[in-house]
Design a protein with these regions (language model features):
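Short regulatory helix/loop adjacent to the ATP-binding pocket of P-loop NTPases
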Residues: 69-77, 291-300
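Short glycine-/polar-rich loops that comprise or flank the Walker A/P-loop
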Residues: 54-56, 81, 278-280, 299-303, ...
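Sensor-1/coupling segment of RecA-like P-loop NTPase cores
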Residues: 275-291
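P-loop NTPase motor domains
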Residues: 1-8, 15, 63-65, 72-77, ...
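Glycine-rich phosphate-binding loop of nucleotide-binding enzymes
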Residues: 1-86
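Hydrophobic/aromatic ligand-binding patch that stacks against planar heteroaromatic rings
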Residues: 49-50, 273-274, 297
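A short beta-strand-to-loop transition that corresponds to the Sensor-1 phosphate-sensing loop
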Residues: 64, 285-289, 309-310
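P-loop NTPase motor core of the ASCE superfamily
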Residues: 105-146, 293-380
């Protein structure tokens, strides 16, 4: 409800694409920004839950594995919840291999190129290494068994100093148990299904880089983790291109982790554009408005939710993201003084106001509570 008027605020997330008179955007994408503990995840979860309840379909990328108990805490829709927990267990080997996860052969090869250039740092401008890598990926793409491990084999067949160097570089990533999700020999029979109404994808042992870490400082495990997020998000494109008559949501929690790298930024724009055509909203959940403020993305975001922030630079960035005066002290104070569960909301008509997110049902409050148990008990 509106904090200023006390009146209920009604949201229909799929409305943007229907060209309703008076709306200032036809973008289905949404952004949820704000520092930890302000209610960002709760609001996001609530919106996804109700969209599913009203007939929509959703895929949630859950890098912190906070939604693993939803089958128990949301028993009334448990039969429609599909939790895909990707551990480094042998049964899951290769499930995130680009050649395995993408239905289309060419899409698989394109994603393999994205992932291997990301991991190795080989740029398209590298006239020595790049053509050798692309040639190996193309050969694997045309073979019977397609998998990233076979790219290493293909490079070694080449047996030139450059090909061997690239092969050794890629092979060094496979020494981590965690990497088995990403690398396969192309004989994997298991696949990830997103046929349920509410699909949650979790990757165990994911280690995301710190928000302020530059790309050059990423550790090997962080590079692998971000690679997996890119693979899963690209896989979500297949989900977006399913039945156009059903409203779909691709929910990207901790979105900053891949918005901060070039491949992730390109992918985000691709998801948003596909979503607009196929009646799917891409939801970016992130701590900073800066992550979603690049012009190419910002102009394609419809609903905006901003939760409390105390950092003045962050406050100004958020106000600018909303298109309101960032230097106005009253605006700054409004954002700084938001209580838990309150947020600044910009709707499809461009109106901005403070709303209180109210779950109505107590069981939803417990289901979507992401606070650690100790803190929760203290509050209760």
């Amino acid at each position: 409800y509106s904090v200023d008027t006390g009146r209920n605020v009604y949201l229909q997330p799929s409305l943007a694409s229907q060209g309703v008179k008076g709306t200032v955007t036809n973008a289905l994408a949404s952004a949820f920004v704000g520092s930890l503990g302000g209610g960002k995840s709760f609001c996001n979860n609530l919106l996804v839950y109700y969209s599913v309840l009203f007939g929509g379909q959703a895929v949630i990328l859950d890098p912190k594995s906070e939604r693993g108990n939803w089958k128990e805490t949301l028993p009334e829709i448990a039969h429609e919840i599909n939790i895909v927990n990707l551990t480094s267990d042998k049964d899951n080997a290769g499930l995130l291999d680009p050649f395995v996860i993408m239905k289309d052969k060419e899409d698989g090869a394109t994603l393999a190129k994205e992932i291997l250039t990301f991991l190795t740092g080989i740029s398209t401008r590298d006239g020595d290494k790049f053509p050798v890598l692309i040639s190996a990926i193309s050969n694997v793409s045309e073979s019977e068994h397609r998998g990233l491990l076979n790219v290493i084999t293909e490079l070694r067949k080449e047996n030139t100093p450059i090909a061997n160097h690239i092969a050794n570089h890629i092979a060094s990533f496979t020494n981590y148990d965690f990497a088995h999700l990403l690398f396969s020999d192309g004989t994997v029979k298991n696949t990830i299904s997103l046929d349920n109404q509410l699909n949650i994808i979790q990757v165990a042992d994911l280690v995301l880089p710190d928000k302020d870490t530059t790309f050059n400082e990423y550790t090997t495990i962080e590079l692998l983790s971000v690679s997996m997020l890119i693979v899963i998000s690209t896989f979500a494109l297949d989900f977006i291109h399913s039945d156009r008559s059903i409203f779909k949501i691709v929910d990207l929690d901790e979105a900053w982790a891949f918005l901060n790298v070039a491949q992730g930024e390109t992918l985000s724009n691709k998801l948003v554009r596909a979503g607009r055509a196929m009646q799917a909203g891409v939801y970016f959940v992130t701590q900073s408005a800066y992550d979603v403020s690049k012009e190419s993305l910002k102009n394609n975001i419809g609903l905006k939710f901003a939760f409390r922030s105390t950092d003045i630079n962050e406050i100004k960035q958020t106000l600018e993201f909303f298109g309101i005066d960032k230097d106005d002290e009253n605006n700054q104070k409004r954002l700084r003084d938001l209580e838990n569960g309150q947020c600044l909301l910009q709707d499809l008509y461009g109106r901005v106001g403070v709303v209180q997110i109210h779950p109505v049902f107590e069981e939803l409050l417990h289901a979507f509570d992401t606070r650690p148990p100790v803190q929760r008990n203290e509050v209760e």
